[in-house]
């Protein structure tokens, strides 16, 4: 019985120490996983879809490159 209570208390302490990931970081991680964008030259990868890392929209110019719009 004591071991079960100890296990529950330890589990509660571990879960209380884990901080939730902010939504912006989750979005950044998912965009990076899709191929990412190139913020240093304001171009985005064609595989990223309609979004860039900085949440700017992309205007598709060709299959290989697209310019990010403000």
From Swiss-Prot:
Proregion positions: 21-34
GO cellular component, one term: extracellular region
Keyword Signal (UniProt): yes
Disulfide-bonded cysteines: 37-53, 44-58, 52-68
Signal as UniProt keyword: yes
Transmembrane segment boundaries: none
Residues recorded as bearing Leucine amide in the entry: 69
Compartments (UniProt record): Secreted
GO molecular function: toxin activity
Keywords, in A-Z order: Amidation, Disulfide bond, Knottin, Neurotoxin, Secreted, Signal, Toxin
Segment forming the signal sequence: 1-20
Expression sites (tissue/organ): Expressed by the venom gland.
Function (record text): Insect active toxin causing rapid but reversible paralysis in crickets. No activity shown in mammals. Does not show effect on mammalian voltage-gated calcium channels.
Domain notes: The presence of a 'disulfide through disulfide knot' structurally defines this protein as a knottin.
Entry similarity comment: Belongs to the neurotoxin 01 (U2-agtx) family.
Protein known as: U2-agatoxin-Ao1r
